UniProtKB/Swiss-Prot annotation:
Biological function: Light-emitting reaction in luminous bacteria. The specific role of the beta subunit is unknown, but it is absolutely required for bioluminescence activity.
Subunit text: Heterodimer of an alpha and a beta chain.
The protein's name in its UniProt record: Alkanal monooxygenase beta chain
Keyword Cytoplasm: no
Stretches of the chain forming a coiled coil according to its record: none
PANTHER family: BLR5498 PROTEIN (PTHR30137:SF8), LUCIFERASE-LIKE MONOOXYGENASE (PTHR30137)
Keyword 4Fe-4S recorded: no
PROSITE patterns (alphabetical): BACTERIAL_LUCIFERASE
Catalytic class of the enzyme: oxidoreductase
Amino acid sequence: MKFGLFFLNFINSTTIQEQSIARMQEITEYVDKLNFEQILVCENHFSDNGVVGAPLTVSGFLLGLTEKIKIGSLNHVITTHHPVRIAEEACLLDQLSEGRFILGFSDCERKDEMPFFNRPEQYQQQLFEECYDIINDALTTGYCNPNGDFYNFPKISMNPHAYTQNGPRKYVTATSCHVVEWAAKKGIPLIFKWDDSNEVKHEYAKRYQAIAGEYGVDLAEIDHQLMILVNYSEDSEKAKEETRAFISDYILAMHPNENFEKKLEEIITENSVGDYMECTTAAKLAMEKCGTKGILLSFESMSDFTHQINAIDIVNDNIKKYHM
């Protein structure tokens, strides 16, 4: 089992932009000295649900601050970016970091972003798949020469080529059943979202396993990642209230058609929020539902920085005891 961190970088009435960015930097430098495997940064546009619109830029900065931990994007939205530019940046970061860069990518979840970035909404899935094929060709071979419905240009070389053989490690966010099935056919590991229910994640995991088996994918080589929010306190109600305040605006924006209070309680119950027993029980259940080999943790809902560090230390001690 491997453990890492992810950063949402939400801003709200208690956390301003500068504080969110500074904490991400401080925690990254801190965990680089510990036993965590990787750090992934979330992409977001046009709202307070994240201040990072360019996760590859942030990844480059954080890679420069660190020595051993792997760092990359959590959900780089390839549908709304030019695939060649993504491939060039990924290869460059892979070279500069000598193989420590990770490319976590995603389809476009927010429908308002497609028209804003002048992308055809009616062909979103086809565009997503074509963008991936171009990026994958560039990362694995050093060249790309697409002849598709959306991109068509002569063969070009990636400069530089990737440092890592076959390119940096890639993950795709499990944003829909269609994306999960597509990823399973190609053997691309998933990142399960913290705000999806355990039931949804379980269905995605089962569907992935079934499709991957049909396509001859070696599931032993697939290292799915599970995102979990952490807010640990011996005062369980305090942890839950902090988490409610942290995620409320996000739920309203991203789950507008669901019952707000029900969704809020579902997320708090199924993530590691509360006292030690509640945190560990919720994490174990979520892991069982997904069958993942990797856990990505966010401690950002804990408003006190010292409490965040203490919680990180507890996880790090458990990694040393049980997973090394």
